[in-house]
C-alpha cells in the first residue's frame, strides 16, 4: 500500500509533546517518562491510533506506547491523541527492527500487533512482526507473564504466525479464525482496518502468544 505523504508532517511531529523523540535514551527508564510504575503496553505499527488511544482512555492505570514508522500515519494518531487529556499515552516514530534498542529486559508487559504488513514475498519473511526473529526480540524485554496479542484478516500471515510461534518455543492461547463470532470478542477494540475489513465480511483472526519463563 502506497502511503500519501503529508507535507509538514515530520516537522509537526518533531515539535509534538506526545511524541518521545529520543527513545533510545529512555531504555530502562520508561517509568520515569510516565512518572509511575504502572504496567507498560505497546502497539507496534499502530496506524492512525484508534486502537491504542481507546485502550488508554479505558485503562488510565496502564501506560501505553504507540509505535509507528510512517510520519503521515503518525500525524493522524497525534490528532486523536490531542483529543484525549490523559497522561498515560505516548507515541514513537520508530522502526521496530531496532526495538531492542529502546526497551530493557522485563520493561514491557504486553505487545499488540494489529493488521501488520504481511510482507507477502518469502524473501521478506523476516520482516513480518510475528516472525521468529521478531519473537526473539520481544522475548528480550517482555516481563515473565507478558504476551503478544495479534490480529489480522490475512489468513496466510496468520498461518505463518501460528507456525512461527510454535517453532520459536512460545505457547498459544485464545486462538480464533473468526474473532467477531467467537467467545473472545467481548471487550475487543477494533482498529480502523478491522472496522473496514469486518464490514466487508472478512473474518478476523486472532492469537495470543506467550513464553513460559522460569
From Swiss-Prot:
Documented EC number(s): 2.1.1.33
Pathway: tRNA modification; N(7)-methylguanine-tRNA biosynthesis
InterPro entries: SAM-dependent_MTases_sf, tRNA_(Gua-N-7)_MeTrfase_Trmb, tRNA_methyltr_TrmB_bact
UniProt keyword annotations, A-Z: Methyltransferase, S-adenosyl-L-methionine, Transferase, tRNA processing
Keyword Methyltransferase carried by entry: yes
GO cellular component: tRNA methyltransferase complex
Active site: 117
Catalyses which reaction(s): guanosine(46) in tRNA + S-adenosyl-L-methionine = N(7)-methylguanosine(46) in tRNA + S-adenosyl-L-homocysteine
Binding site for S-adenosyl-L-methionine: 43, 68, 95, 117
Function: Catalyzes the formation of N(7)-methylguanine at position 46 (m7G46) in tRNA.
UniProt name for this protein: tRNA (guanine-N(7)-)-methyltransferase
Originating species: Lachnoclostridium phytofermentans (strain ATCC 700394 / DSM 18823 / ISDg)
